[in-house]
Amino acid sequence: MTPQTLNQKLTAAHIPPDLIDKIEQMTAQSKSNPLLVEPTQKYINMMLSLPWDAVTRDTLDLSGARAILDKHHYGMGVIKDRILEYLSVLALKARGQKEGSRAPILFFVGLVGTGKTTLAKAISEAMGRRYARIPFGGMGSALDLRGQSRVHPDAEPGQLIKALIRAGSKNPVVLLDELDRVAESTRADIMGVLVELLDPEQNVRFVDHYLDYPFDLSQVLFIATANNTKNIATAVLDRLEVIQMPSYSDEEKTAIGRDYVFPKQLTATGLSNETLIIASDVWPLIVRPLGFDAGIRTLERTINAVCRKVAREIIEGKSKKVEITKENIKQYLPSEVG
């Protein structure tokens, strides 16, 4: 690639002029040192992949947002109202009424399976923004977030920069998932990076060690989740608005299973509501096969297992249509609960 072609590519990607100068210097140095060719090309490709100027346009329509939330989540009236208030603040900010309109960072806290991650996805869909998730479970180093210096042979950017590349936009919804599950040995360092990420005074010039150049994160919409707040640093909590997720009652889980999970699993397994029917008095047996469960993970797995067994039965020619009743439910429940 000629210097002129490289310059044109970098300029077209809206890379800042001083960074273009730096890249061109690196390229010139690599010509006299073969060992620098591969890492320099890797760096250039990474810079070209970053969404320096790419943004999506928000669709902040509250009635549409409510419909999306209702489509994905049963009940949760208080939480949905809080999310709509949150979106209203963002809408006012977008109109230019910025004074006092900075939206806090939502922090969904609750047991596994209570809908934290899917709420974040629903917010992304409601806003028309792209979505990326950063899992914190078992994260063992602050470098996982901030990246490694290019002096290391296998250096890479941190999870945040990778998330932006995956999203392909500068303003995605980024889910910081399970903040409470980072490795204990590096918790303090990771929390320190989080403070910087979530602080609007600092994240406008976030420096990933691999990039070695400030990147503006001010348009990223961060949402966080955790099972509890016990292991979250106070400085991080101060930047988050905790929203406690409720546990589901059996009646709520019945409605969720019947009206939300079951139709999705029918589609996922190639069935229809004509080939698989579940009698209404069977749902209590499906909802609580293992005793108390605050979330719906067990419910989702159980319904999925039932659908898979029916799909196999139909493919093997044993049935054309299956109706599950109290009399035959046990043969369709997964073995660990049947």
Where are these regions (language model features)?
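Extended, charged alpha-helical coiled-coil/arm scaffolds that mediate oligomerization and mechanical coupling
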Residues: 1-93
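Conserved C-terminal "switch" segment of AAA+ ATPases
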Residues: 12-18, 55, 168, 228-238, ...
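Hydrophobic positions in the central parallel beta-sheet of the AAA+
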Residues: 106, 174-177, 224
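AAA+/P-loop NTPase substrate/partner-engagement loops
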Residues: 126-156, 163, 183, 252
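AAA+/SF3 P-loop NTPase mechanochemical coupling elements
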Residues: 167-171, 189, 206-225, 276-278, ...
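Walker A/P-loop
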Residues: 98-136, 165-166, 195, 199
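Conserved catalytic/switch belt of AAA+ P-loop NTPases
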Residues: 176-215
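Short loop/turn elements that form and flank the Walker-type P-loop nucleotide-binding site
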Residues: 101-104, 127, 146, 154, ...
